[in-house]
């Protein structure tokens, strides 16, 4: 099982920290999980303009490939202006819908306003629905106050939600792949 964590921003560190913590927890729960972090700020991803994948630059092709071959995902975004980042939306636009179909997604987000947790419900989950992906029932939203001055996640309730999300993603993936849903198709 390949679990890909996606930090869907070009700035800041809190989103990446949240995604990494879910990955680490998933590995703790299930040591055979192959975890990988895709931090969009490490790549020069071109804007999606509808051309063939092979005509994008090397970084863009690599990112598309990493997303396409993963079995399940933890996807993170900061909330800017009440929405997901343009970088994350661009990534979704680059990915073929078939690449994400019937795969499990878990979502994390962070921001400076407590009400922005609704972006997970109102934007990320509908995107997952478009891709016909399975979504973990829980999610993690962390406010700036949940981190200390060193950007370490210190809030115990948020840390518990991180652990719960990791458990849900791992167990949903294994349950779906063990024959439950796919055995009856």
Swiss-Prot record:
Catalytic class of the enzyme: oxidoreductase
Pfam families, A to Z: FMN_red
Entry's Gene Ontology BP terms: anthranilate catabolic process; L-tryptophan catabolic process
Record protein name field: NAD(P)H-dependent FAD/FMN reductase GTNG_3158
Catalytically driven reaction(s): FADH2 + NAD(+) = FAD + NADH + 2 H(+); FADH2 + NADP(+) = FAD + NADPH + 2 H(+)
Subunit: Anthranilate 3-monooxygenase consists of a reductase component (GTNG_3158) and an oxygenase component HpaH.
Higher taxonomy: Bacteria, Bacillati, Bacillota, Bacilli, Bacillales
Cell wall biogenesis/degradation listed as a keyword: no
């Amino acid at each position: 099982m390949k679990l890909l964590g996606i930090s869907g921003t070009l700035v800041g560190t809190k989103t990446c920290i949240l995604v990494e913590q879910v990955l680490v927890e998933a590995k703790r729960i299930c040591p055979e999980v192959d975890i990988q972090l895709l931090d969009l700020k490490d790549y020069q991803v071109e804007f999606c303009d509808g051309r063939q994948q092979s005509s994008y630059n090397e970084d863009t092709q690599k990112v598309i490939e990493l997303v396409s071959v993963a079995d399940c995902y933890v996807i993170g975004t900061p909330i800017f202006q009440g929405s997901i980042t343009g970088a994350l939306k661009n990534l979704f636009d680059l990915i073929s819908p078939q690449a994400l179909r019937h795969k499990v997604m878990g979502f994390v987000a962070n921001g400076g306003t407590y009400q922005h947790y609704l972006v997970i419900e109102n934007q990320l989950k509908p995107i997952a629905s478009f891709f016909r992906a399975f979504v973990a029932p829980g999610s993690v939203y962390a406010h700036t106050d949940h981190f200390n001055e060193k950007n370490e996640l210190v809030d115990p309730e948020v840390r518990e939600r991180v652990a719960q999300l990791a458990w849900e993603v791992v167990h949903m993936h294994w349950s779906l792949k063990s024959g439950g849903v796919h055995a009856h198709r």
